Amino acid sequence: SDLKIQLRQIVLILVLGCILEGAPLWAQWRADILPGYSQLTLPMGADYSGEVVATLVRRDRTAPAERALLYVHGYNDYFFQAALGDSIAAHGMDFYALDLRKYGRSIMPHQDPFEVKDLKEYYEELRASMKEIRSEGAKEIYLMAHSTGGLISSLYLEDTKNSDSIRALILNSPFFDFNLTKAQEKVLLPLVTSVAGLFPRTIILPPLKKPHVYDQSLL
């Protein structure tokens, strides 16, 4: 009867709605700015500057591998090293990279680039990335990090007691300390910290220092 047909249509709509509502994150993957790569937006809720997202980048592949590597960039940086991802894939591993909140693909119009008050803020996107990679079939995850990403990743693994069961941490020129003399650390660091506390948006540069070509290429 017409009533039964209508009821079936209603049930079908409800079922489809539930499926779409609970759809896994992989359903949202889309083409990245790098050829042969895809990206996934990871909603991170809101912080002191408003809505926040992170971006997980994945090298395209025909089938998932059991081993995967996640790359975390450094300060004033983002993932663009396609050759690195290609090399990792050539060795039989899936390759992922994370653009942290307020960096690269994750910068939103209302945000100040790289703004952070506590490095632990980044733990959320690291955790979400691991979860997504696991959901795609990876049984082993290796973490590679550069510069400030090395500091963030090391702190994350220490604070979480490696609850994500990362097999290895690979550090590329990690930032663990300032490249200053002991005398400079005693004078400059307290001075900069004091200025930052009073004028948090002030840009401080060494005298006559010009932006590096590498910095300009990223910006």
Predicted regions and their residues:
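Catalytic nucleophile-loop/oxyanion-hole region of alpha/beta-hydrolase
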Residues: 75-76, 104-140
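N-terminal cap/lid segment of alpha/beta-hydrolase-fold proteins
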Residues: 28-62
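Short beta-strand element of the alpha/beta-hydrolase
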Residues: 66-74
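The serine-hydrolase catalytic nucleophile loop
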Residues: 76-86
